[in-house]
Amino acid sequence: MKEAQDALRTTGIPAFALAWRSTAAYPTAPDQYIVYTTMTTESEHWDDALCQYQIYVYLNLWSKGDPTGAARSILQAMRSGGFALVEESDSFEEETEYFCISSTWLLRKEADSDGT
């Protein structure tokens, strides 16, 4: 979703939709990167017409080092983009030695007059 891409771009942290994949720019996983997916649902109808929908962003921040600063940057960027934090959790992957901060974000948008 464009709204998520635009918000995450301001962090300066490499962000990948769905999964990190090797590219010419990133032949190996960066020390810090974001992977995200989105889901859109219809949330409000008036007289059988769509009035509002919700965009959920499921985001994972992966970091070899302390992820605190990057997590703050993401929080500021997503809030500036109009998203609200729904939940957040953290973990550590011993095999890869990456910290992972998983979060769910929500953006409510008014539907256009044609229902899109």
Q: Which residue stretches match the model-derived regions?
A:
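Generic structural motif
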Residues: 23, 39-41, 64, 108-112
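Compact nucleic-acid interaction/catalytic patches
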Residues: 68
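Generic signal for short, ordered secondary-structure residues
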Residues: 38, 56-57, 84
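Small/polar-rich, solvent-exposed N-terminal microdomains that initiate assembly or binding
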Residues: 1-47
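Oligomerization/assembly interface segments of phage tail-like spikes and tubes
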Residues: 51-65, 99-109
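Short, solvent-exposed beta-strand/turn "edge" segments of beta-rich domains on protein surfaces
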Residues: 46-50, 94-96
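Acidic-leaning, charged glycine-interspersed low-complexity segments
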Residues: 72-116
